[in-house]
């Protein structure tokens, strides 16, 4: 999968789309791509070659959100957590448009279809 190439430094994050929350902030590992109007706040880890597309919201204000290597969050999706319910997305995952993921675990190489809702403590297996 080819993603738009980031500009130096290795990650392209336009000003104003990320924010710290109670000393929690984005940790970007390797090269990745984040759309200019995506909202990312709090304790978020984005692994190498991952992407977050237009109008997506990642809120790590309560627990950590991890976006695995080569995974993508498509347009309009919302990712959030609750106390004791972090959100983990494995490698090679595609999260379709307008998906709601809340405090769940998505294993490697999985497709989450357009408009899906997956809530606290749910676990979706590989493939």
Where are the regions a protein language model picked out?
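Terminal amphipathic alpha-helical/low-complexity segments used for targeting or macromolecular assembly
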Residues: 1-31, 37, 43
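Sequence/structural signature of small/polar-enriched beta-strand/turn repeats
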Residues: 2, 26, 46, 64-67, ...
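Polar low-complexity intrinsically disordered regions enriched in Ser/Thr and small residues
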Residues: 19-22, 63, 106
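Residues at secondary-structure transition points
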Residues: 23, 61-62, 83-84
């Amino acid at each position: 999968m080819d993603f738009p190439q980031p500009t130096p430094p290795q990650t392209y994050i336009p000003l104003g789309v990320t924010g710290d929350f109670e000393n929690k902030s984005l940790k970007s590992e390797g090269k990745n791509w984040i759309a200019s109007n995506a909202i990312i706040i709090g304790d978020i880890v984005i692994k190498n070659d991952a992407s977050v597309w237009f109008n997506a919201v990642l809120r790590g204000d309560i627990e950590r959100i991890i976006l695995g290597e080569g995974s993508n969050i498509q347009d309009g999706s919302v990712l959030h957590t609750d106390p004791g319910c972090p959100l983990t997305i494995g490698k090679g995952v595609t999260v379709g448009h307008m998906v709601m993921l809340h405090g769940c675990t998505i294993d490697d190489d999985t497709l989450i279809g357009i408009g899906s809702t997956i809530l606290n403590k749910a676990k979706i297996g590989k493939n």
